[in-house]
Amino acid sequence: MKSSLACVVLCSLVAVGCAFKSGAPQRQCEAMRPYHEGSEPQTGRAPYTISFSKNKIAPGERISVKITGEGNERFKGFMIQARVGDTPVGKFSSSNSIKLLDCSGTSNTATHTSNTPRSRVNLFWTAPKDLTETVTFKYTIVKDYVTYWVAHDSPKLTIA
């Protein structure tokens, strides 16, 4: 009995240890998946939205990007990239509550710095000066350890 209890406790600690409480690590740049032990990503629509301060911007322009939970929906973690195809582009600006990652470019990915539940995150993103394309923001949202949505697409943002 004692060994069974010890095994359960140890397995619980290992599973919790795999969570990214202070933001996604750089090795998650491509897949954008948390790989929480014993869980799979949600397949339905995420109860979170991505919105922009503008739907069309000029090359080199900075916009605000907001991740918001619908209703009272809260989340503990996130990871977001602006992409052209599979390539992260642009640059996020830093703040105390956001960790920036270099995923094949400087500061082109943003993630959380703590797993404190929140209902929204405000970010700033700057388009590359030489880019005139349509960009899609890919985002992963973690509601809790077993409930998360991976690499969902935002509405398109035109850079022209």
Segments the model singles out, each with a brief description of its role:
Residues 1-160:
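Long, disordered, Ser/Thr/Pro-rich
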